[in-house]
Amino acid sequence: MSGRVTARRRVVRLTPAGEIRRQDTLAVEEPLEIRIGGQSLTVTMRTPGSDIDLVHGFLLSENMIGAAEDVVSARYCAGTDEQGRNTYNVLDVELRRPVPVRTRHVLTTGACGLCGKTALDEVRAVTRFPLPAHGVTLAADVLADLPATLRAGQSVFQATGGLHAAGLFTVDGTPLAVREDIGRHNAVDKVIGWALRENRVPAHELVLIVSGRASFELVQKAVMAGIPILGAVSAPSSLAVDLAEEAGLTLVGFLRGETMNVYSGAHRLRSVSAGTRTA
């Protein structure tokens, strides 16, 4: 599977000095069809690798499972490319308890037909792991260092410049799992799936860091896994902030260097400075 994460392609690089023809390294993007008991559930475009974790995280986010033991088996189905090699692009999952399967059963795609308020109500209603109002806290200086630790684990991004990343950390800054993917939601599903399979869900004492922006979908996935703190290198969306406030999640954006914007749940962060001012 590791050989399928990157691919080499010819590229013409245009520079002020002229054309340079060379090989370039690209991140692989392939479809993964998820089936439940042989019935197609959804197809996601992903970077191959950690597919079992991805599926566990996705099913948890969709409230189809709540623990690792809810999955009896997950196996690749037969499927070959033009060279006769297994594509490893179809995963069939057997669940311990039957659940209704609707094709493309998702809470968080643009095609799901949910308005913002309805989406908030549905996520709040179905989460199995409500976030505790108090409990874990995180030092702001520790949080500020986590994006650099995340980048250090992005080996494929360093080779391609084309992948998102997500990481789970302890509140003292120890990295537990870092995953990369062409889709930021897949990267989050991969680390959440890892946590589920390691019996660390609900993840009430962990921190989720993502390499890009914080969308509603990523906040929803954090809430469904019981993660109390989500930090993003870029901006959150308005709906992401709405959901974070509703769920009691600490949402931090523009996490760059020593500065950051805390959009909700500031009570979980311990500042190194006692000074506070309003702009």
Swiss-Prot record:
Does Cytoplasm show up as a keyword for this record?
Answer: yes
Chief subcellular location: cytoplasm
What is the name of the protein in this document? Sulfur carrier protein FdhD
Record: active site: 112 (cysteine persulfide intermediate)
Q: Which GO terms describe its cellular component?
A: cytoplasm
What the protein does?
Answer: Required for formate dehydrogenase (FDH) activity. Acts as a sulfur carrier protein that transfers sulfur from IscS to the molybdenum cofactor prior to its insertion into FDH.
Q: Give the record's keywords alphabetically.
A: Cytoplasm, Molybdenum cofactor biosynthesis
Give the NCBIfam families listed for this entry: fdhD_narQ (TIGR00129), PRK00724.1-2 (NF001943)
| GO MF term set | sulfur carrier activity; sulfurtransferase activity
Which family, according to UniProt? Belongs to the FdhD family.
Compartments, record wording: Cytoplasm
Check the record and name the SUPFAM superfamilies matching this protein. Cytidine deaminase-like
